[in-house]
Amino acid sequence: MKTTRAIAMLGLLLGLAACGTTPSTIVERPTTARPQAPAAVPATNGAIYQAATYRPLFEDRRARHVGDVLTIVINERTRAGKEASSSASKTSAVDASVGGVAKLPLKMFQGLGINAEASAEYEDESALDSSNTFSGNVTVTVIEVLPNGNLVVAGEKQIGLDKGTEYIRLSGVVQPDTIQAGNTVSSAKVADARIEYRSSAKFDKAEVMNWLGRFFLSFIPL
């Protein structure tokens, strides 16, 4: 009975150790527009121009309403560098002597001198350079129109490969004036942008600590 219980416990621990989770997403809002209730059709007054169905005649069809789509051209390059140096030095000296004192018990110590010197130096230099590049396209959906006319957009692209699935997610706020021809906008023009690339491949899962390891490190930090 005890042997069976020990084997079961060992199997449970091995299963927990093998469990790994993919990194959490930074895109918290929905990545697509929710179905909208049909808008009430306003009564027509017989005029050719109707504000509810207005579309500019001499410009491309661009995203304006909830549910419209536009393409974000991702072209992100970041680079950061840091250099630091420090140095310190310290020197100390001691010089002492015993003169001729007639009442000194031991005559052998008369004229004794002590001379000591000590020095210490410290110097440290460090340099850090990091660069990242992220390019691609992802089509997003307008999920909300703010009172000032700006568009809250979000979208996700999934690419299934032999060894896993790649996820590209994006969310942010787009100003309609920055939308270019072809209904595209540069990622540099997206406010509050959250752009991420994730993968469910085994290589990426190996970088995520399993559940059991995170449990023990929660109260036994390295």
From Swiss-Prot:
Covalent lipid adducts (S-diacylglycerol cysteine), residues: 19
Which keywords fit this entry according to its UniProt record? Answer: Bacterial flagellum, Cell outer membrane, Lipoprotein, Membrane, Palmitate, Signal
| Topology term for the membrane | Lipid-anchor
Keyword Oxidoreductase part of the UniProt annotation:
no
According to the record, the signal peptide region is 1-18
Q: Which GO terms describe its biological process?
A: bacterial-type flagellum-dependent cell motility
A Pfam family it matches: FlgH
HAMAP family (alphabetical) = FlgH
Name recorded for this polypeptide: Flagellar L-ring protein
Gene that codes for this?
flgH
